[in-house]
Amino acid sequence: MSYTLTTWNDFKNYQSTCYRNYLYASEGLRCMGSTWSVLAPLKGLGEDVYILGGEPHAASTAGTFPEEAREDISAAEIAGLGFHSCSYLKLFVGEVVRDKIAITDGTIKEGYPKPDLIWTTHLCNLHSKWYQEVSRRLGGIPMYPIDMIGGGDAEKDPKIVKYVCDQMEEGIRWLERVTGREFSDESFIKAARNEIKVLVLWGNICALNMHAPAPLDERRLIALFPPAMVDRTTDEAVQLYEALLKEVQHMVETGQSVVPDQRFRIVYFGLAHTYGHPEIARILRDAGAEIVASVYTFGTAGNFRGFVNGNWSWEPIDPAWVDELDLSSRRDALSALAKIVLGWPTWQGVRSYWALEQMARAMVTEFNADGLLLAPTRTCETDFRNGYIAMQRIFRNEIPTVEYDTETVDVRKMDIPGSKRKTELFVHLMEAHKKGGA
């Protein structure tokens, strides 16, 4: 019997409330940017800071309003953005062009809510350009991008950590200058500890999928990690993920799962695409094949032990470690934040293929995978596209491995019939491998 998460509605409500606060704020500060950024510095400006993050907003809009998403993408292309550029970027800019915005509770608001500032990171070539274009179209919104140097073990390199910390420290002075507000180190440090705690808690939740049956499937994982992206700096966010961890631990102890029929365990590398293409997810579900581990859902807003003595580990970090962190000064908090975000799995593989291989080997082993599904996104520069070719060679003689191009939100760029055929082939390969015939 399938287990129903009791915390499900709390997660949906938190995400929708954050978006509604941004849309309808009559006072306070609206802040926009990549939620792949360190968010805690924004909370040093006060509790009335409302955040709209590009990636989770674009993804949730595509899932909630697929027709609106297509109109947004078309509007952005008509306005001059390239056909092959990031689909999330075009959806986001398309809302600005159309002067309307849609959020997860079903609201479509006419009149785009103009942000007071843009606080973001620059990881791929489009990250800062995304918000530079939004700033330009909205009349020149003040913008501060932080240049991130990803790559294997970057969080252990003091030069890289200092480089990121220095930018954030200058960014705090910039925030004071453009808002006219005094920065509170006390509020910032509290938000920093919450931010780190949520990332560690999500890593703990994901690691529980090492058990059989895995308590969570990809559909739930996709739906449960966005609140950590939307705003992970609040006490409420910490409480949400603490409650979820406790519930999933109970599921493991009692052998329960949201999908108890798990004949095949799949490790997935790529951006989450099955939420937009249920016909592909259905092929896997009907065969009892479940994605139990995904670098995207695990590593976009979660932290793990990472590299230990040169080898990657998906084992979780003890949440008590966060409580013991010395965050007594602004610089201490900035350093801890820089290390935690540089340690995100999704950033490791963006700049380092040896890290990508290490993560894949560890995930296949630690999550006891029956198959490896590789689905690079055509328009995402930070997806691990080039590394997938090597991964096919590495794993093809070990476990069934299938690769096909996909797309996050723009169905025009996805070969649905071809992807369905490859997914069916993938199921047959796993069946044959389990019987000893492949």
Regions found by a protein language model. Give the residues of each.
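C-terminal regions of proteins
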Residues: 391, 395, 402-438
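A charged, amphipathic alpha-helical module
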Residues: 1-29, 165, 169, 173-303, ...
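Proline-aspartate-enriched helix->loop->beta-strand connector
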Residues: 115, 364, 368-374
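Redox- and metal-dependent alpha/beta enzyme cores, enriched for Fe-S-associated oxidoreductases
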Residues: 27, 36, 41-76, 272-352, ...
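An N-terminal, globular interaction/scaffold subdomain
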Residues: 31-117, 122-131, 135
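Internal, well-ordered alpha/beta segment that forms a basic, Gly-enriched binding/recognition surface
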Residues: 111-208
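A short, acidic, amphipathic alpha-helical segment used as a generic capping/interface helix at domain edges
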Residues: 103-107, 348-368, 385-386
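Short acidic, glycine/proline-enriched helix-loop-strand junctions
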Residues: 134, 138-142, 383-410
